[in-house]
Design a protein with these regions (language model features):
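ATP/NTP-dependent adenylation/nucleotidyl-transfer catalytic domains that generate, transfer
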Residues: 1-288
Length: 288
């Protein structure tokens, strides 16, 4: 459905491309050159069959991995993405101030992320949420944060994702964000591999369907260049998903270890660390 395959639905829009449903494959399918005995299986059904076949749980519960690999988790950029008009930003700030009860403030990041809104693919701004008085992660009111994260995209159509800052580093988070250029290369790929390993090692468990790290070139006043987001979701079929809740779906200790290991990553140049608190929809599982 998300590939917009007309054989599945005459009304579905393309949300993302799947490697087994590109135009070349569709033409081969029309010519009878492809046999797909399990073409309509969802990931949870694939895992169920794997267990029925007696495969090791490590294989049966393996995370999905995008065809382009970590490349879709490196948010490449030639510079900052345009922000919404000032009047829209003012309304946005006022709305969040009201629903956050003065405990949080929100910034629209100069980067775009992929989402799904109204059965269509969206490429819109990311909202970053900051505590006015930072506390230890174990004292964080996650229920309140998730409620704010649900409200923002429902009210503002230029937002399709919300990430909560769990470690601001040396940044003055009220200062303007800067977004330098970043392109895929062995240097940034090596950094992301190390950070992603820390995330999956600590956060992944049987409750979580997928977790990973996202790297993007954004900072405020700190000299470090890169920020990272932790993404962990709970879902059975990946058509919809909820963001895993720290302290419920995985332990706060695991999140604290992850933050410490990201900070310690060699040459990672870490500015800020965020936790993605957005469900699907309005976001997708991946950021790109």
């Amino acid at each position: 459905i998300e590939s917009g395959n007309p054989d599945v639905s005459g009304y579905a829009n393309k949300i993302k491309t799947h490697h087994n449903d590109v135009e070349l494959v569709r033409k081969a399918r029309e010519r009878g050159l492809i046999i797909e005995t399990n073409w309509d299986w969802h990931k949870d059904e694939v895992r169920k069959v794997a267990r029925m076949l007696g495969l090791d749980e490590e294989i049966a519960s393996r995370q999905p991995f995008p065809g382009p690999g970590l490349g879709v988790r490196l948010l490449c950029s030639d510079g900052p993405a345009p922000l919404p008009a000032d009047d829209r930003l003012a309304a946005f700030d006022s709305f969040v101030e009201n629903i956050a009860d003065g405990k949080y403030f929100v910034r629209v990041a100069p980067i775009n992320s992929v989402g799904v809104q109204g059965d269509n693919r969206s490429y819109k701004s990311l909202a970053t949420l900051f505590p006015k008085n930072p506390t230890a992660l174990r004292d964080t009111d996650w229920a309140e944060i998730f409620a704010i994260a649900r409200a923002i995209p429902n009210e503002f159509d230029f937002i399709n994702g919300v990430a909560y800052c769990i470690d601001a580093g040396d940044n003055d988070t009220t200062a303007p964000f800067t977004c330098a250029g970043m392109h895929i290369g062995s240097d940034v790929a090596g950094i992301l591999r190390e950070v992603d390993a820390a995330v999956t090692k600590n956060v992944m468990n049987p409750k979580i369907a997928q977790c990973f790290a996202v790297m993007f070139p954004m900072t405020a006043t700190a000299p470090q260049k890169y920020s990272f987001a932790i993404r962990a979701v709970c879902t059975s079929d990946f058509m919809t998903a909820k963001s895993a809740v720290p302290g419920v779906d995985f332990t706060i200790d695991a999140l604290e270890r992850t933050v410490s290991e990201i900070r310690a990553a060699e040459d990672a140049n870490v500015s800020m660390i965020f936790y993605d608190v957005t469900g699907k929809p309005p976001a997708t599982v991946e950021w790109e």
